[in-house]
């Protein structure tokens, strides 16, 4: 079994939990609360900006020009392409996407996730650590989207079905490239290093779950019992 396949196998129980948590189930049935949807859009706008920055940190660690070119294309996709998925959610709540994201949020779970990725990008020389921190994001979206399209419970009359359709294919190339890079970059790693990389991947998968739950619950910072508004 390839190392990338092993990572996905071990992450599957977490991804199954994500699928059955309230946020994705709300999308599946077409009844995701409006405020949870808007909170997700605001949080994800901040997250994707940082995700693009982490791609930029990953580029100098790449020794292959084709890999560099692909990462540059992914930055462009984050800037332009992924907005299409966000527009679907904005249409669902019948508000302008640009107006929704004018209000900024930086919740605890999103903060922890982003710092987890930055830590691995800065502290670890081997790019496998950075990729392990980043790869669960596209893989989780691909998996839950494809699972939803197979699910008889999917509300096909809801515009949210288009969100699943978008992610069911848009992540395919990125997942393949990340898998190939992961297998190549860990080929000569020690078992200790591979275990660290695996933990990094699984932690990011947990962060993905926390991000969806954070959005559903409209999570905020609490200082001494007082919420920071």
Swiss-Prot record:
Gene3D superfamilies: Heme oxygenase-like
GO molecular function, one term: thiaminase activity
Biological process per Gene Ontology, one example term: thiamine biosynthetic process
Positions contributing to substrate binding: 44, 141, 167
Pfam short name (any one): TENA_THI-4
Entry annotation: catalytic residues: 137 (nucleophile), 208 (proton donor)
GO cellular component: cytosol
Reactions catalysed according to its record: 4-amino-5-aminomethyl-2-methylpyrimidine + H2O = 4-amino-5-hydroxymethyl-2-methylpyrimidine + NH4(+); thiamine + H2O = 5-(2-hydroxyethyl)-4-methylthiazole + 4-amino-5-hydroxymethyl-2-methylpyrimidine + H(+)
InterPro entries (alphabetical): Haem_Oase-like_multi-hlx, Thiaminase-2/PQQC, Thiaminase_II, Thiamine_Salvage_TenA
Pathway involvement of the protein, from the record: Cofactor biosynthesis; thiamine diphosphate biosynthesis
The keyword Transmembrane appears for this protein: no
UniProt KW keywords: Hydrolase, Thiamine biosynthesis
Chain positions of site Increases nucleophilicity of active site Cys: 47
EC number, as in UniProt: 3.5.99.2
Recorded family membership: Belongs to the TenA family.
Quaternary structure and partners: Homotetramer.
Chain's role: Catalyzes an amino-pyrimidine hydrolysis reaction at the C5' of the pyrimidine moiety of thiamine compounds, a reaction that is part of a thiamine salvage pathway. Thus, catalyzes the conversion of 4-amino-5-aminomethyl-2-methylpyrimidine to 4-amino-5-hydroxymethyl-2-methylpyrimidine (HMP). Is also able to catalyze the hydrolytic cleavage of thiamine; however, this thiaminase activity may not be physiologically relevant. Therefore, is probably involved in the regeneration of the thiamine pyrimidine from thiamine degraded products present in the environment, rather than in thiamine degradation.
Family matches, as PANTHER family: BIFUNCTIONAL TH2 PROTEIN, SI:CH1073-67J19.1-RELATED
Name the UniProt record assigns to this protein: Aminopyrimidine aminohydrolase
